[in-house]
Amino acid sequence: MLLPDSNTLRFFLWWKEGKVRGEETGRVDLDLSATVYSDNWKYVDHISYTNLRSEKMNCCHSGDITSAPQGASEFIDIDLQKVRDAGGRYVMCSIQSFTGVPYCDLPQCYVGWMSRKEPESGEIYGNRRGQARPFLRQPYFDSDGDRS
C-alpha cells in the first residue's frame, strides 16, 4: 500500500461482543499485531500484546484488551522513520482471534489504518482520517514509499 503523508502510521482494531443470529458470542479476545521486515524480508521486530513497545523503532501498542461487551479497541503506532533507521522496510499488520471466535460471527468488527501527523494529539481514530475497511489481503507498507 502507498504510504500516508506523515511519519506515523496507526493500525487499529475495534470490535464488540453480543448476539449474532440469536446466539451470544461470549468473551471475544482479538489481538492486533504489526511485524517489521528488512529489505530482504528478514524479521526485524514486532509489536503485539507480547511486546507492547519497541524502543529502537519508537513503536507502541495500546495494550491487550481481552473482552469487549461494550466494545473495545486496540491500536499500534509505527514511527516510519525510526523503522527505516532500525533497518526495517516492510510493516505488516495482522489480527488474531485468541478465543477462536470468527470475525464474521461478531456483531461489529472493524480494522484499518490511518496516518497521524500529530501522534501526541490524543486522537484515537476516525473514518474520515482512516482507511476503516476489512483487509481483503494482509496489508503491508513499504517504508521506502513503494506500492505493494
Predicted regions and their residues:
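Intrinsic-disorder/low-complexity signal
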Residues: 1-148
